[in-house]
Curated annotation (Swiss-Prot):
Catalytic reactions on record: succinate + ATP + CoA = succinyl-CoA + ADP + phosphate; GTP + succinate + CoA = succinyl-CoA + GDP + phosphate
Family named by the database record: Belongs to the succinate/malate CoA ligase beta subunit family.
Enzyme class of the recorded protein, top EC level: ligase
Amino acids binding ATP: 46, 53-55, 92, 95, 100
Any single Gene Ontology cellular-component annotation: succinate-CoA ligase complex
Taxonomic lineage of the native organism: Archaea, Thermoproteota, Thermoprotei, Desulfurococcales, Desulfurococcaceae
Species in which this protein is naturally found: Desulfurococcus amylolyticus (strain DSM 18924 / JCM 16383 / VKM B-2413 / 1221n) (Desulfurococcus kamchatkensis)
Binding residues annotated for substrate, in chain numbering: 256, 313-315
Keyword Magnesium among record annotations: yes
Gene: sucC
Molecular functions per Gene Ontology: ATP binding; magnesium ion binding; succinate-CoA ligase (ADP-forming) activity; succinate-CoA ligase (GDP-forming) activity
Residue stretches making up the ATP-grasp domain: 9-236
SUPFAM superfamilies associated with the record: Glutathione synthetase ATP-binding domain-like, Succinyl-CoA synthetase domains
Protein name according to UniProt: Succinate--CoA ligase [ADP-forming] subunit beta
Amino acid sequence: MKLYEYEGKEIARKYGIETPRGILATSVEDVDKAYRELNTGTVVLKSQVLVGGRGLAGGVKKASNLEEALTKARELFSMSIKGERVEKILVEEAVCISRELYMSLTVDRATRKLVYLASGMGGVEIEELARKHPDKILRIPVDPFIGYSGYMARHALGFLGLQWDKLGQLDNIMRAMYKIMIDYDAELVEFNPLAYTCDGRLTALDAKIIIDDNSLYRHPDLQPLYGRDATPYEKVAKQLDFNYVELDGDIGVISNGAGLTMATMDSILHYGGRPANFLDIGGGATRERVREAVKIVVTHPRVKAVLVNIFGGITRCDEVASGIVEALSETKVAKPIVVRMLGTNEEEGRRILIEHGITVYTEMDEAVLRIIQLVRGVG
């Protein structure tokens, strides 16, 4: 679960990490009040969205006077960034920046440890930095039996090229990041940029914290926030009790069982396609459940074609086939659909699909290759 920047900064301040003075605004009138209260001349207006890339999308603006702040606030409140409307703006004092650094603590799934990532090139996406300048990133693994230790700050200090008198500040920040990570069951604590200000302070100009959804039972204060970062399709799927996650591809995926669904996605990637989602209908899915699953996937604007991969154990293939046909009849969406079907009542399921002009395969690889051809407009 992602937290907004202002929420991440509230947590950071609670643990002693310095952030710029700021006030949250939900209207232009609030921006007016915030500007007057900050009484600082130049301010930064930062749209509060849970998607990335807001800076490139124009979601962060500077203003040097009240009139300019109100004009730019109106612009921000009228924006949508990657489909998410801007409903909150963090109005912050502008900070004189000497250098922009990067600092995060995250989970290294390969080593099954927490790892600090530090770089002297802050303000850019860490994925882009890792791709273009991997030598500019310092990795400091954390022994789970020891936790944070002061040598980590000394190591980072030298790599970042900071003066020795900044060790205390950096140590406090890294120690606090570790405490936040543990106390909140976080998957990521990131300050990008972590600014080295003109007067020699280390200040978190941005804060990104992601909480492990599975830990929310331990955090009742965070439970009301769960699901707010879901897309409209994910919200519908949640209401219907589907395991559904949106991805960036264009091939819709529906299968039964998490293992088979992931294997289907892996196969699509292996042959050069890009899955648009993960949707597991579960075992013993009824015609009605299949119908609703297909409707979610086939109506998504990014999906160009749909692959349904079913192994019929307690799931009956004829029920699946009937659900597919009903969904296509109700939605009237003309997108290619390919089905791989094997197992209980397979023959009846194949008959139903073939009668309605839907291609059916027995082998998964054949079905995957066919759906990729259809997406590419081949055959």
